[in-house]
Amino acid sequence: MQIPRSVGTHDGSFHADEVTACALLIMFDLVDENKIVRTRDPQKLAQCEYVCDVGGRYSTEHKRFDHHQVSYTGSWSSAGMVLDYLHGLGFLSHDEYEYLNNTLVHGVDEQDNGRFFSKEGFCSFSDIIKIYNPLEEGGNTDKEFFFALRFAIDLLTRLREKFCYDRVCRDIVKQVMEKESVCLRFDRPLAWQENFFSLGGESHPAAFVSFPCSDQWILRGIPPTLDRRMEVRIPFPEEWAGLLGDQLVQATGIPGAIFCHKGLFLSVWDSQESCEEALNLVLKQQRLV
């Protein structure tokens, strides 16, 4: 007889794929954390409603998600299998599925299946989960597994919150793109850059974006593409590079000048008025107005 809301996974050293798979099932209220069974005993696994990363079977109908058997020829690990399962059940929209997959789960699949290895100096999510394992192999790893599980749940929760926030921002960005040509003006800080390019920003004429931040205003150059995000379509004047306060005031002739990044892609102003003045100055120098 199966234990409702239970999930079985292998014991011993753990990896990001089964940790992520369990975290996803918990997040969507399909299993209980206190009903995670870590074992390789087939009889105990048979009692679990879900089984991840062990058991030699992949069947969404029977809620079995293992990828190690020869009969499975796909590219997923147990994490990708469970994410796809949740999508199929309607827990995730297509957009949210793509977001979670592209942001986290695909990387877990790639690393677990040996198709990706982190370069020196870089630490992936899978690397972090691996570090949660005990330093010495052998013995009980349940305590460390649950530490890693809670970390994964927290990260996935934050990613879902960010996805929802980004979708709200996307609507605002779309509205501003429809009415502005040279500069996208926002009345608050928001996630504009990725949304701008996902909405066709590469062909949009805007070269700048402005928005308030704390008690100041940001004027930033827009990149030509998302992949070239540290470049800008129109840079600030070279003589502004790296200047602060009075130095920038003297260089620009604008009393509200605070800072210009040495990369000439971002500047800070004390008010919306001084920010607009800076924008107009740059546009005049570029003979765009």
Swiss-Prot record:
Q: Which InterPro entries match?
A: MYG1_exonuclease
Q: Where is the signal peptide?
A: none
What PANTHER family does this protein's entry cite?
METAL DEPENDENT HYDROLASE - RELATED, MYG1 EXONUCLEASE
Protein family: Belongs to the MYG1 family.
Q: How is this protein named in the record?
A: MYG1 protein CT_386
Organism annotation: Chlamydia trachomatis serovar D (strain ATCC VR-885 / DSM 19411 / UW-3/Cx)
